[in-house]
Amino acid sequence: MAFASSLLALVALAAVTSAAPATTQATCPDGTKVNNAACCAFIPLAQDLQETIFQNDCGEDAHEVIRLTFHDAIAISQSKGPSAGGADGSMLLFPTIEPNFSANNGIDDSVNNLIPFMQKHNTISAGDIVQFTGAVALTNCPGAPQLEFLARRPNKTIPAIDGLIPEPQDSVTSILERFKDAGNFSPFEVVSLLASHSVARADKVDETIDAAPFDTTPFVFDTQIFLEVLLKGVGFPGTRTTRGEVASPLPLTSGSDTGELRLQSDFALARDERTACIWQGFVNEQALMASFKAAMRKLAVLGQHRNTLIDCSDVVPAPKPAVNKPASFPATTGPQDLELSCNTKPFPSLSVDAGAQQTLIPHCSDGDMTCQSVQFNGPA
């Protein structure tokens, strides 16, 4: 569609400020050739992360670390003074402070899981560990882009300021202003970053339910999130006891297979005149999901100077290939359930999944009810 083409053009026009020039190419101990010898340290870290935490799965441990990369980076402010915050690993360096901010509820699991890696791979800074771990986690999610990774962030000595992380109950105006203050993010970049909600689940929005997914394919980096947030809500997967949640189109829950939870902020961004057409433009446009990479390229260096960092993107593992399944209306939903606020662009023609009843969203990527997960004890 024409709108998708224009958005792809915006992705292509992303800033191309270079990192520090690579030094002489090097061969790492395992035989991998890299553009800078400093990148070799991340190869055993990637292997350690996959074997110890992720098991090459786009599961809960991967989801939580991807969330950590965002929460660590966005806590910086141009208006309040960027003396602290940004993508600096301060979540790991101050585990008894930042994880206790209300917006970071539940992030202690990923913080505690990464602290041992900071100790074991002690030549790598906390900020590098957070962003590299997020890049590795994302490679386990089919369809995800291979993120840029720049190394040699210094360790910070003070924690970030509280109150800088957007929350699901925030208004669209508040969210857009927060992103602008953090790093001059455009509305398109904000929506692009929310592509990560395609592989996300919530434990703390409604604490009566566990690992509530935001779409029906939480283990695949696809565009279902952008379609399903546009559908009419009919109920709640849990008890609706907290702020930040609105009715979901697919709330059916059975045992550990939790129904879809809809964030109030996603609902609002999909319907606001400033972002509705951007949101709608992502539906069934898998190529546009690559804009997440461009937006993360910017987010991952907030508070840093790109020209002092080293490009180690060549040690980020190759992601799993896309599933290549077009977006579709889940069973029991259809075009009649769309709540569209963008009237200037045509909506794509999509198929409807067969079934007279709502299909349960599996708790685990293999369809099982019990998933292997890692949880280390720690200070957070």
From Swiss-Prot:
<feature type="binding site" description="axial binding residue">
    <location>
        <position position="197"/>
    </location>
    <ligand>
        <name>heme b</name>
    </ligand>
</feature>
<feature type="binding site">
    <location>
        <position position="222"/>
    </location>
    <ligand>
        <name>Ca(2+) 2</name>
    </ligand>
</feature>
<feature type="glycosylation site" description="N-linked (GlcNAc...) asparagine">
    <location>
        <position position="100"/>
    </location>
</feature>
<keyword id="KW-0464">Manganese</keyword>
<feature type="binding site">
    <location>
        <position position="217"/>
    </location>
    <ligand>
        <name>Ca(2+) 2</name>
    </ligand>
</feature>
<feature type="binding site">
    <location>
        <position position="90"/>
    </location>
    <ligand>
        <name>Ca(2+) 1</name>
    </ligand>
</feature>
<dbReference type="InterPro" id="IPR019793">
    <property type="entry name" value="Peroxidases_heam-ligand_BS"/>
</dbReference>
<dbReference type="InterPro" id="IPR001621">
    <property type="entry name" value="Ligninase"/>
</dbReference>
<dbReference type="GO" id="GO:0042744">
    <property type="term" value="P:hydrogen peroxide catabolic process"/>
</dbReference>
<dbReference type="InterPro" id="IPR002016">
    <property type="entry name" value="Haem_peroxidase"/>
</dbReference>
<keyword id="KW-1015">Disulfide bond</keyword>
<feature type="binding site">
    <location>
        <position position="198"/>
    </location>
    <ligand>
        <name>Ca(2+) 2</name>
    </ligand>
</feature>
<feature type="disulfide bond">
    <location>
        <begin position="28"/>
        <end position="40"/>
    </location>
</feature>
<feature type="binding site">
    <location>
        <position position="215"/>
    </location>
    <ligand>
        <name>Ca(2+) 2</name>
    </ligand>
</feature>
<feature type="binding site">
    <location>
        <position position="220"/>
    </location>
    <ligand>
        <name>Ca(2+) 2</name>
    </ligand>
</feature>
<dbReference type="GO" id="GO:0034599">
    <property type="term" value="P:cellular response to oxidative stress"/>
</dbReference>
<keyword id="KW-0408">Iron</keyword>
<comment type="similarity">
    <text>Belongs to the peroxidase family. Ligninase subfamily.</text>
</comment>
<feature type="binding site">
    <location>
        <position position="203"/>
    </location>
    <ligand>
        <name>Mn(2+)</name>
    </ligand>
</feature>
<dbReference type="GO" id="GO:0046872">
    <property type="term" value="F:metal ion binding"/>
</dbReference>
<feature type="binding site">
    <location>
        <position position="86"/>
    </location>
    <ligand>
        <name>Ca(2+) 1</name>
    </ligand>
</feature>
<dbReference type="Pfam" id="PF00141">
    <property type="entry name" value="peroxidase"/>
</dbReference>
<feature type="disulfide bond">
    <location>
        <begin position="39"/>
        <end position="312"/>
    </location>
</feature>
<keyword id="KW-0349">Heme</keyword>
<feature type="glycosylation site" description="N-linked (GlcNAc...) asparagine">
    <location>
        <position position="155"/>
    </location>
</feature>
<feature type="disulfide bond">
    <location>
        <begin position="58"/>
        <end position="141"/>
    </location>
</feature>
<feature type="binding site">
    <location>
        <position position="88"/>
    </location>
    <ligand>
        <name>Ca(2+) 1</name>
    </ligand>
</feature>
<feature type="binding site">
    <location>
        <position position="64"/>
    </location>
    <ligand>
        <name>Mn(2+)</name>
    </ligand>
</feature>
<keyword id="KW-0325">Glycoprotein</keyword>
<dbReference type="InterPro" id="IPR024589">
    <property type="entry name" value="Ligninase_C"/>
</dbReference>
<feature type="active site" description="Proton acceptor">
    <location>
        <position position="71"/>
    </location>
</feature>
<comment type="function">
    <text>Catalyzes the oxidation of Mn(2+) to Mn(3+). The latter, acting as a diffusible redox mediator, is capable of oxidizing a variety of lignin compounds.</text>
</comment>
<feature type="disulfide bond">
    <location>
        <begin position="364"/>
        <end position="371"/>
    </location>
</feature>
<dbReference type="GO" id="GO:0046274">
    <property type="term" value="P:lignin catabolic process"/>
</dbReference>
<dbReference type="GO" id="GO:0016689">
    <property type="term" value="F:manganese peroxidase activity"/>
</dbReference>
<feature type="binding site">
    <location>
        <position position="60"/>
    </location>
    <ligand>
        <name>Mn(2+)</name>
    </ligand>
</feature>
<feature type="disulfide bond">
    <location>
        <begin position="277"/>
        <end position="342"/>
    </location>
</feature>
<keyword id="KW-0479">Metal-binding</keyword>
<dbReference type="Pfam" id="PF11895">
    <property type="entry name" value="Peroxidase_ext"/>
</dbReference>
<keyword id="KW-0439">Lignin degradation</keyword>
<keyword id="KW-0732">Signal</keyword>
<dbReference type="GO" id="GO:0020037">
    <property type="term" value="F:heme binding"/>
</dbReference>
